[in-house]
Amino acid sequence: MSELLKMEHLVKYYGNKTSLTKALNDISLTVEQGEFTAIMGASGSGKTTLLNCISTIDRPTGGKVWIDGVCTSELKKGELADFRRNRLGFIFQEFNLLDTLTAFDNIALALQIQKCPHDKIKEKIEAVAQKLGIREVLEKYPYQLSGG
């Protein structure tokens, strides 16, 4: 197995010298390809902060994060944007789909933004939908879909 995610001595502080909040303090973790990992803890324990640092939504104050061998902590702003667009996928609990578009069209829009060739979009969507077992919902609108 190979390392899919690696964190070394991850630190995230908020605030300033007079009012400093240590959200993450020296977190190290490795997740191998194929493993499932759960992040659990009490409210305010740093779960969301940790996920935001891993996903590059927020920069850690210290330490390093590697995703599939790429040290995201060292990427410049433009490189980080390219990495997010081309290598990461996000599924938020409160996703923002366009209500006037079907699930298929919402997915197609994301592929168009990524400059996917028009003639490949349908093929890509159908292949992924088949893998995920969601072909039957592609023509539904967001309000017709379950949040789960």
Show which residues each predicted segment covers.
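ABC family nucleotide-binding domain
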Residues: S2-G148
